Structure formats: C-alpha cells, structure tokens
Amino acid sequence: MPAAVPFPSPATSRRTLRGRPLARILQRESRFALFAAATLIAAFSPATYTRPVRQATAQAICFSAWQALPGYALLSVLAGAVLTHIVAVSAASYGLSHLALEAVVRVYVIELLPLVAALFVALRSGLDLLDRLAAERARGADFGTPMRFRQQVVPGVAGNLLAVIMLTLASGLLVLAVAYLVVYGVTPWGLADYTRLVGQVFDPVTAPTLLLKIFLFAVAVAVAPVAIVLDTPRRAASGSEMRVMARLLLLLVAIEGAVLMLLHF
C-alpha cells in the first residue's frame, strides 16, 4: 500500500473552502479519486497479502461471491427464461422471431445483468462493509495506518470486486444456455445458428467493451463503500448509507453512459 492514504484534514478544508461549495465538492471528489487509486494499488499488490490479510480476503470472497452465487444465479436464470419466452412469443406474433434471441442477448445479458449484479453486491455485502467501517471510524479508528488499512479495508474491496465479476459472468453464461433451451428446446440442431448469433453480438468491439464495463462496475462497487474511512468520526457516526449509495449510483450511471457512447458513437 502507498505510504500515505489521502485522508482529509477537515479543519484546513473548512477554513480554506468556506463559502465555496463547488471548490469543496471538487476537493472531496479529487480526494475520493486519489483514495480509490491507492486502494486499488493496494488490492492488486502481492505484498499486501500477508497471512492475516489472505485469511480475511478469503472470508470476504466467500461471503460476497461464493455464498451469493447459487441464489443469484437461480434468480437470473429464471428471469432470463421468462424474458426470453415473452420476447420470443411477442416477436413471433409480428413475424420477427429471428430477432428474439438477439434482443435478449443484447438487452438482458449485455445491459441489464452487469448493472443488476453490481447493485446486488452493493446492497448485500457493500452495505455490510460500509456499516462495519463506519462504526470503526465513528469510534476514532485511524485507517491511515498501513496495518489497519490492509486488514480491514483491502479484504472487503477484493471480495466485492471479485463478487461483481463472478456473478456477472456466471449468470451471463447460464442465461445464454437457458435462452437456447427456451427457444430451441433440448436439441443440438439449433447450435450452429445460435453460436453464429452469439458471435455476431459479441463482436471484437462489444466483447472487450463489456468486459471493461464489468470491471469498472466492480471497481465502483468495491471502492465506494470503503470511502467512508475518509470521513471524520463525527461525520461517519451521522449515517452515510444514502450518501455512499448516491455516489455509487452516479458512478454506475456515468460508466454506463460512457460505455454506451463508446459502443454506439
């Protein structure tokens, strides 16, 4: 982890930026960006993972990703099967059955599943991590020390980041398989057409862009809750769930908008 994490100096900030709301917002967001960069460097650095940190990270991954995977995958598959059936029946009634599967893949797998997975992880394990860190910070815990930062912040970041990636990819693959079964049934005769369709949808531009979006969603969900450690103890004790979730939602919307512009313009 870098030697210095960009923690706030509230007294100085209030003196220098009083009466300048825009400057305060810019300073707060720049501090958040520096903190996010430092946190990601720590999370991807092998030197961070001492034995206690590895154990805490394994527990975080188990809670955030592994325990959530069966239920989330089941719900995604059921929703995908229902959506595929509705779209296929509706498209057939208009003579557009050849477009049904493509619509499901483009809308559900590429657009909806990554966003739903990000929100699911944020509400399930992100809020849990936020509450624990907020309670520690409210009691005056100093997360600027490397040991505390590595042991209490990095495991949650790694767990949430991997959870978003794992849930999105696993549910996406399962939905692709279920969509084929809903339209073609248990038969191999549609595999050639379906494989060609999936290859056309995930072209050399769409596939890496989708992976980039999933990764950015994962980073946003991983970093946003732990930014509570930047708050003063008094501010952390006042309740920060709405503020953190609002920032996370804005980040997800900004990422989605940037990806749509990259794909379609």
Give the ranges of each region predicted by the language model.
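Short helix-terminus and kink motifs of transmembrane alpha helices
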Residues: 85, 89, 119-135, 222, ...
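Membrane-embedded or membrane-proximal helical elements that form or frame transporter/channel pores
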Residues: 73, 90-129
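Hydrophobic alpha-helical transmembrane segments of multi-pass membrane transport/permease proteins
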Residues: 68-89, 251-258
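Selective transmembrane-helix segments that form parts of the transport pathway or gating/packing helices
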Residues: 65, 69, 73, 149-174, ...
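Final/C-terminal transmembrane alpha-helix of multipass membrane proteins
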Residues: 237, 241-261
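Membrane-interfacial helix-loop-helix connectors in multipass membrane proteins
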Residues: 86-109, 170-215, 219, 223-243, ...
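Short cytoplasmic-facing helical segments at TM-TM junctions of multi-pass membrane proteins
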Residues: 131-157, 237
